[in-house]
């Protein structure tokens, strides 16, 4: 899996159709140029972020391969690779940096807004590798969050199962009442890292209740609100537009982690980025 940047934002308005034929020809030419630039940039990104591991992906239990190609499988780093290296391509770095918001009022972020290291994580509540990350790695990062070194910002990439978008909508609904991370913990605690959980409105309401969401009627309404649905759709489309196709995927300051990695690998990456930021 690789990240590839979208076409330059200045090309966003090229979809308008001028009345004059000469203007239409110019528009078509610019679109062709934009597409060629996007292809070249995508090749650069693929080269920059291609995983260095040479082993075949392993499943959560070493005996079962997740069925979805959109999940980023565990790949053992090379013997020399104990952390994710910093990206070097300026264009890729610009994309990575633009994904960080540092919004103090973001209900789906935890950690100080001015923390030296920000991890932007693209995840899916039905992804077994995301479940492994939530169960095994995130608890090992608690001291870094509480100590002010690390901030985590969540992004939805809801695509593993047909009910992944509904679960993502439920996450937003929980966040509207200040209980996103409690909901996140409840969902992943109940998930089996060997499988792909399917969700219903009722099962998500039950999880919201476990997470302490105070107004469950509002939770259900927000979960099904068209604004929430559109937010999840747009988040997934945005991830795809910058080339993120699988989960989990993490941007950690100037580095990127493609797929599940053990806690030591993630902590080493954070430590290196913190030192670089100091």
Describe each model-derived feature in a short phrase.
Residues 99-117:
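A short beta-strand-turn-helix
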């Amino acid at each position: 899996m690789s990240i590839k940047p979208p076409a330059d934002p200045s090309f966003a308005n090229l979809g308008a159709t001028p009345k004059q034929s000469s203007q239409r020809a110019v528009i078509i030419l610019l679109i062709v140029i934009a597409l060629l630039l996007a292809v070249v940039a995508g090749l650069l990104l693929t080269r920059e972020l291609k995983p260095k591991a040479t082993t075949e992906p392993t499943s959560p239990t070493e005996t079962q391969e997740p069925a979805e190609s959109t999940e980023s499988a565990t790949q053992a780093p090379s013997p020399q690779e104990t952390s994710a290296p910093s990206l070097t391509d300026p264009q890729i770095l610009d994309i990575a940096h633009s994904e960080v918001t540092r919004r103090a009022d973001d209900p789906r972020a935890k950690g100080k807004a001015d923390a030296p290291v920000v991890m932007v994580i693209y995840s899916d509540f039905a992804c077994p590798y995301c479940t492994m990350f939530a169960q095994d790695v995130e608890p090992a990062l608690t001291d870094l969050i509480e100590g002010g070194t690390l901030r985590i910002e969540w992004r939805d990439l809801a695509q593993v199962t047909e009910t992944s978008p509904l679960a993502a909508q439920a996450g937003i609904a929980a966040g509207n009442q200040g209980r996103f991370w409690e909901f996140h913990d409840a969902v992943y605690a109940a998930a089996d890292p060997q499988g792909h959980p399917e969700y219903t409105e009722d099962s998500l309401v039950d999880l919201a209740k476990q997470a302490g969401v105070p107004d469950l009627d509002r939770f259900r309404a927000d979960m099904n609100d068209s604004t929430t649905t559109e937010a999840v759709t747009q988040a997934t489309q945005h991830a795809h537009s910058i080339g993120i196709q699988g989960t989990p995927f993490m941007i950690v300051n100037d580095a990127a982690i493609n797929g599940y990695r053990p806690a030591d690998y993630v902590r080493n990456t954070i430590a290196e980025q913190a030192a670089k930021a100091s």
